[in-house]
Amino acid sequence: MVHRKATAGSDRIVGHLVLPGPLASGKAKVSVSLIDATMADQPASVVAKTEFVIENNTDNTIEFVLNAARCPTKRRWLFDATVTADEEGRLMPGDFVLTRSIVYVDPVRSADIVLDLERVT
């Protein structure tokens, strides 16, 4: 479920990461980014990023919140996400990563942002 709350010149995007199984350890670092990938001839730019630590998570769904500057419509938006046991964010076997790029035309008006992650082997 996505909730949109506009504040002075910004958008708040709430979504969920879905893991295919439990965390390998009791503690993990979560990183989620929103990337503007509109211009094919220019590098994609990170518009918003959030990082946080979860502990003793028994649920396979993790809620995330991104606070971005106002997201214009008619652009190509890409999400990037990782869940790692390493505090530095290095991927190891047993961690989770978003391997399929998911593009939205307007993420703040999308009905549902659910990102399915895959386990790193």
Regions found by a protein language model. Name each.
Residues 48-70:
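A beta-strand/beta-hairpin structural motif
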Residues 11-20:
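A short, amphipathic beta-strand motif
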Residues 82-98:
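Short acidic/polar inter-strand loop motif in beta-rich domains
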Residues 73-85:
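A short, solvent-exposed beta-strand micro-motif common in secreted/extracellular proteins
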Residues 21-27, 71-73:
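A short beta-turn/strand-edge loop motif at beta-sheet boundaries
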Residues 2-6, 102-121:
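Extracellular beta-sheet/turn segments enriched in Thr/Pro/Gly and aliphatic residues
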Residues 45-55, 98-103:
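Solvent-exposed serine/threonine-rich low-complexity stretches and specific carbohydrate-binding patches
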Residues 19-21, 36, 85:
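Short solvent-exposed capping/turn motifs at the termini of beta-strands
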